[in-house]
Amino acid sequence: MSHTAKSKTLQELDIEDIKETNPLLNLVQGQRIVQVPELVLESGVVLNNFPIAYKTWGTLNEACDNVLVICHALTGSADVADWWGPLLGNDLAFDPSRFFIICLNSMGSPYGSFSPLTINEQTGTRYGPEFPLCTVRDDVRAHRIVLDSLGVKSIACVIGGSMGGMLSLEWTAMYGNEYVKNMVALATSARHSAWCISWSEAQRQSIYSDPNYLDGYYPVEEQPVAGLSAARMSALLTYRTRNSFENKFSRRSPSIAQQQKAQKAEVRKPSTVSEHSLQIHNDGYKCKANGAIAGISGQKRQSVVSTTSSSDSLTSQSSMTSVSSVTGEVKDIKPAQTYFSAQSYLRYQGTKFINRFDANCYIAITRKLDTHDLARDRVEDITKVLSAIEQPSLIIGIQSDGLFTYSEQEFLAEYIPNSQLEKIESPEGHDAFLLEFKLINKLIVNFLKTNCKNIMDAKPRTWGGDVGNDETKTSVFGEAEEVTNW
């Protein structure tokens, strides 16, 4: 599809109608959803009349070039005010009195854009596991259509972290410096590493292993919550560091309030030693209630015995060494600690996540990440792709990031000619790009003052709309749950 300075206005969809089939839209306030007529995906699949969600702040100037495109991370939404709120506001990095700020929701996300929750017109049901593979480049091309419909002539700066950084890199590589003037990429990579691909696979396998997954054809109200929760816990560990968790949690027990946040199930007091052991063993198991499990211990034990063949009898002389018994009174048992604050935190995060995300969407977006490679279908040598990026670029890395390592940021800065590299010294790992607000704000403001001088020096426009949250407020969509608030 060709692009013009002013493309045909896109049809705006009624969000209330879409909410009937996608209740997760209730979590995003103030966004708009438009219908894109057509897009041919990289795979060759043709999309017709599909939705893209976005949210804006500020006003487009007369030249239609004061545009900041903010790209969200893996499970984020178009609501920048929620997950990067401390950067949004007058005289901040994302200043709506100077810039027209827009964040477009990536395809595969459950928050408004084309996703497994979208209704397939041909079947009248959700796409579910039949949702087509959408790449980072597909996102950029779909988002460009929306920008054209809004009259955007060029982008002053594209900014994103993690998956959002992948989109930022593709924006610059796909459209050049005539359209994209500057770039800021945080905690990202030129191509998705084997390490990251492996973590994505482990998280998908968590979902697949849930018996409620049903090949992806599960009812939305009965999605595989145990698998999705486990996937989220696994992901969170990659966003932090060993020292971050040790400093906060150590081996402490969770408080009553923390246990309530984690929705730790109340279990009945065990009446036998076996029930006591079973409750410890299955603590955290989400597929059955602990009380019910304890009540069937004898039955389960009997079923194991009854399936043993006579030749392997538990009473035979050859197997006597493997036979034992457990005795004692429950009141006399004093077990070692088995429930820790770190576990409580992970369970809380898992429970919080399943109430705001969809399992098929999680699978779709992690596969999107796996496709990311700036050199794919361009040239074999990725350094040549990076060397062709002409835009002034700010690369921000995190010294303790174990997912998108600092060496990967150094690689970007080494081969992108007009780039500067900044390091965030933080013990918080990958999530620091969503936590170190003051430093990130300072770095971006300084970069924009240098490279978007005309816009930054222009008289600010009056902007009385909503702005971001301060850093003490809890984010709904952010990758980071401020661990210090736990």
From Swiss-Prot:
E.C. number(s) listed in UniProt: 2.3.1.31
Catalytic activity reported: L-homoserine + acetyl-CoA = O-acetyl-L-homoserine + CoA
Biological pathway: Amino-acid biosynthesis; L-methionine biosynthesis via de novo pathway; O-acetyl-L-homoserine from L-homoserine: step 1/1
GO biological process: homoserine metabolic process; methionine biosynthetic process
Residues of the active site: 162, 162 (nucleophile), 401, 430
GO molecular function, one term: homoserine O-acetyltransferase activity
UniProt keyword annotations, A-Z: Acyltransferase, Amino-acid biosynthesis, Methionine biosynthesis, Transferase
Keyword Metal-binding in annotation: no
Biased composition (Polar residues): 250-262
Chain spans, region Disordered: 248-274
Pfam families documented for this protein: Abhydrolase_1
HAMAP family: MetX_acyltransf (MF_00296)
Family stated for the protein in its record: Belongs to the AB hydrolase superfamily. MetX family.
Summary of the function given for this chain in its UniProt record: Commits homoserine to the methionine biosynthesis pathway by catalyzing its O-acetylation.
Name this polypeptide is given: Homoserine O-acetyltransferase
Encoding gene per record: MET2
